[in-house]
């Protein structure tokens, strides 16, 4: 581990030199790439340097114990050694996490797709609740949201809503939201007070740049039509809505949120690119996933990952056994406690895999 950390520190110092090189400064691509690489390494290097400093302080403190000291001073040194040893241990654990392989998509923007599943209109209302929850969370992080496509229902819910979240690190925090979300509550239309169970599915996809997913224009069929509102009525007499069909994969994306056909096509292309990337990624992992499922059970998107229980004001994430009695706050966008727990769980699993492999 420490050989790797030395190599990381050397690379970081080399990047500092490169970023002062006039040839690099005058080359926007190199400047951008080297700056990003340096930023990615910075936390690891600073943590490693703190670790080395603590080690030096620890050695000096232990050396002091070899000298003749007054009893009071000796106790102070022993106390300092205890604190330094605790700090050293914490830094080692942090460095182990920092050296874990990074998800290359973590810093990307996100395309989120929420769809009402079992439960009819109640499921559509819940899809709307989830949409508001994620947009409020995005606001708390300083991220921007933009609706790409929406199919609203008459009571204020959504059969489907697709939206973009623009912000640094958005995918790293929201990628754990993939799956089926379940709600338990008494619908407003329920006169008998019975609790109903409904579900909505969430897909979180990293936004892909054109260079990352090559799409041949001849493989895309473009259809245009007039935009429609709830119930199917036409709300736009111009042919501004766009439907893109990727012929090789059969993936279809529709966008009618903008009044401009060009803007609708641009938005649809972003979603199409992300879905194609996701499909190829799933196919590439299929063989590995099959082996893993046989060993530890399934973990695909169709499984229930979280339950939102209104009568008990409770949220339970079934993957990590986390229960929070703050449903009202969670739906208002306070997702940090859940997301941080999921990130820690993911890191723990990766550390376990790394230890098994070593």
From Swiss-Prot:
Record carries keyword Protein biosynthesis: yes
SMART domains in UniProt: PCRF (SM00937)
Keywords: Cytoplasm, Methylation, Protein biosynthesis
One Gene Ontology cellular component: cytoplasm
Compartmental location: Cytoplasm
Domain of life: Bacteria
Annotated InterPro entries: PCRF (IPR005139), Pep_chain_release_fac_I (IPR000352), Pep_chain_release_fac_I_sf (IPR045853), Prokaryotic/Mito_RF (IPR050057), RF-1 (IPR004373)
Cited PROSITE patterns: RF_PROK_I
Name this protein carries in UniProt: Peptide chain release factor 1
Gene behind this protein: prfA
